[in-house]
UniProtKB/Swiss-Prot annotation:
Family per record: Belongs to the aconitase/IPM isomerase family. LeuC type 1 subfamily.
A GO biological process held by the record: L-leucine biosynthetic process
Phylogenetic classification of the source organism: Bacteria, Pseudomonadati, Pseudomonadota, Betaproteobacteria, Burkholderiales
Cofactor binding comment, as recorded: Binds 1 [4Fe-4S] cluster per subunit.
Record's protein name: 3-isopropylmalate dehydratase large subunit
Species whose genome carries this gene: Burkholderia vietnamiensis (strain G4 / LMG 22486) (Burkholderia cepacia (strain R1808))
Enzymatic reactions: (2R,3S)-3-isopropylmalate = (2S)-2-isopropylmalate
Length: 469
């Protein structure tokens, strides 16, 4: 019987299935960070349990770490406690960890693939919503809660119910100025934030196959924002080429065996999906969110939607509430919206490809950030990304234009460290969520691609980067 990619990943990891469909899944890799792991380790200590498979875990501090000068440590006592606790727990249990001043430190969903700890055919979990990122490698990856983090540490298994299969098929050549971020925002705009609820989404089609691994990770990263349990892309040469030579990846004869096995992780011809959604890449335009949900998104050449045109009273009320929070008037051209701050970073868009795309725009415009922009910051996704960008001189491109070049971490994506918006400030952000207060109490977030964020920094407002030539 023909199987989907999700079917194959699920079936190769089921240990036991109950009559009600609940399955015990074997977990190949658990990624840990400082926010959702302390209670899990405490549970192990209270029960006097060891970590079942130490080598299956990889830890890093990312949410609370400062992105400014780290020589003075962490100023906030709560953040310091969380980071110190992860350090102590990993030392006590013998878990591999990249500590704050390790060159390999970075955002958990960037360092996993970067190190080759994320591999095709794996089940991967982390106490973090955007674990779906790792599905770009033909893996089954999703976020879990803290009690489940403890369960995986203790047993290397997890209780789950199987999701339905969805295929999001994007065909055609992506227009100039459009990126993977625009693809996934367009998808969410089409199906909504509940469109993927109950599903595992496979992203396919010629447009997805043409993306780099960095682009595929961006798309899978935001599968959760469409309501899906997981997002994934089939294994191909692009996947294999990216992984070769990375630290955690098999070598020699084991590499050849692994590649042969990994290539099985694609949907079979004739495999049946419960839902299929199709998009024409040629119709995608650079995207900008206007509201307080990723589904509240439109094209840069459009206007802020008018709630009066929405027939559904529930949706109309949500639109009105969002516009009030965002301080936007209906029918305002998106290009006329001024911004106060710029954030280029996060597990969605802080890889070297993203940094290069933003730097290209800054260099092309050849001006400093606009006078109305109070802060423009670039936060690389890892120490290795930062070092690579500096070797290429990209840091100087940004600093010469008035941007701040920071240390790696989650930063302003969720404002758990000192990087945040003040009430009423408007930000062009390359992150993944634009909820109320996400980047700081009263902050107003617009989600865009790195190129769009860079252009907004220079111009002081959103611009259609297709016009830049």
């Amino acid at each position: 019987m023909a199987q989907t990619l999700y079917d194959k990943l699920w079936n190769t990891h089921v240990v036991h299935t109950e009559d009600d469909g609940t399955a015990l899944l074997y977990i190949d890799r658990q990624l840990l960070h400082e926010v959702t792991s302390p209670q899990a380790f405490e549970g192990l200590n209270v029960a006097h349990r060891p970590v079942w498979r130490i080598s299956a875990n990889l830890a890093v501090s990312d949410h609370n770490v400062p992105t400014t000068d780290r020589s003075h440590g962490i100023a906030d006592p709560v953040s310091k406690l969380q980071v110190d606790t992860l350090d102590a727990n990993c030392d006590a249990f013998g878990i591999t960890q990249f500590k704050m001043n390790d060159l390999r430190q970075g955002i958990v969903h960037i360092i996993g693939p970067e190190q080759g700890a994320t591999l095709p055919g794996m089940t991967i979990v982390c106490g973090d919503s955007h674990t779906s990122t790792h599905g770009a490698f033909g893996a089954l990856a999703h976020g879990i809660g803290t009690s489940e983090v403890e369960h995986v540490l203790a047993t290397q298994t997890l209780l789950q119910k199987k999701s339905k299969n969805m295929l999001v098929k994007v065909e055609g050549t992506l227009p100039r100025g459009c990126t993977a971020k625009d693809i996934v925002l367009a998808i969410i705009g089409k199906i909504g934030t509940a469109g993927g609820t109950g599903y595992a989404i496979e992203f396919g089609g010629s447009t997805i196959r043409a993306l780099t691994m960095e682009g595929r990770m961006t798309v899978c990263n935001m599968a959760i924002e469409a309501g899906a349990r997981a997002g994934m892309v089939a294994v191909d040469d692009t996947t294999i080429d990216y992984l070769k030579g990375r630290p955690f990846v098999p070598t020699g004869a084991e590499w050849d065996q692994a590649v042969e096995y990994w290539r099985e992780f694609k949907s079979d011809e004739g495999a049946q999906f419960d839902r299929v959604v199709e998009l024409n890449a040629a119709e995608i335009v650079p995207q900008v969110t206007w509201g307080t949900s990723p589904e509240m998104v439109t094209s840069i050449d459009a206007r802020v939607p008018d709630p009066e045109r929405e027939k559904d009273p529930v949706k109309r009320e949500a639109m009105e509430r969002a516009l009030a929070y965002m301080a936007l008037e209906p029918n305002t051209p998106m290009e006329s919206i001024n911004v106060d701050k710029i954030f280029i970073g996060s597990c969605t868009n802080a890889r070297i490809e993203d940094i290069r795309a933003a730097a290209y725009v800054v260099k092309k415009l050849n001006r400093r950030i606009a006078p109305n922009v109070r802060l423009a910051m670039v936060v690389p996704g890892s120490g290795l990304v930062k070092a690579q960008a500096e070797r290429e001189g990209l840091d100087k491109v940004f600093t010469d234009a008035g941007f701040e070049w920071r240390e790696p971490g989650c930063s302003m994506c969720l404002a758990m460290n000192a990087d945040r918006l003040e009430p009423g400030e408007r930000c062009a952000s390359t992150s993944n969520r634009n909820f109320e207060g996400r980047q700081g109490a009263g902050g107003r977030t617009h989600l865009v691609s790195p190129a769009m964020a860079a252009a907004a920094a220079i111009e002081g407002h959103f611009v259609d980067i297709r016009k830049l030539g």
